[in-house]
Amino acid sequence: DEIYRAKQDKPELEVKILIDWHRAQRNLLGAEKSATNADWYCEQRQKYQLADDPNLFFGVPINTREVFGVLHIKGFVFDDTVLYSGASINNVYLQQNEKYRYDRYQKITHSQLADSMVAFIRDFLLNSDVVLPLDSVNRPKTKEIRQNIRHFRKNLALNGQYKLSSAVDFGNELTVTPLFGLGGAGNVLNCTIEDLFQLVDEKLTICTPYFNFPRTLQQKIRHLLRKGKKIEIIVGDKVAND
């Protein structure tokens, strides 16, 4: 509701929210079969009379795994501020209705980094014939665009990249480099993670929701242990988080 109110109060505000195409069209928990998140977006759009405005919610048909399993991380760009978190924007994480779930947040204020992420969204996601509005009643069925989805994923895996002249330097202790990777072959993100394993001097700390590492990483961990390096693995626990 807050997003729609903000758009209603300030029509010139640019709002684009990208969500998993498949998950957004599943049934809401405990709701009848016809009710999905996408249906709710349409209802809210009609409620706040935004019919003539650009769409706010878009579905991205990518549901694949990264090197450490499914990476449930969310990215937000507010003007020149980038916010990364494992949390969703919902009542539980915002401590509404007497419930609160803790998560981690990284807040980075840097105009070039924010611009590079917005440019990536515009160039590689919104500029596609399969990243479609979810707050529209005229949504195609997934099977109708399946061939286009395969082409989209292949093209994104081959060409997707952030356009930033150099890493964002925040002093001696922190440098931020946006990397994109999709799929198994030539995945820059996965390759970079594996290469970092080779640079450990004393200790490696891994934060991961899963413990089933790919075989290549298992081999690298064994190699580090044989060389006497310390390895700390922090595994997410749902009960503890809740």
Task: Report the location of each language-model feature.
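Charged, low-complexity intrinsically disordered terminal segments
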Residues: D1-W40, L50-D53, F57, P61-K74, ...
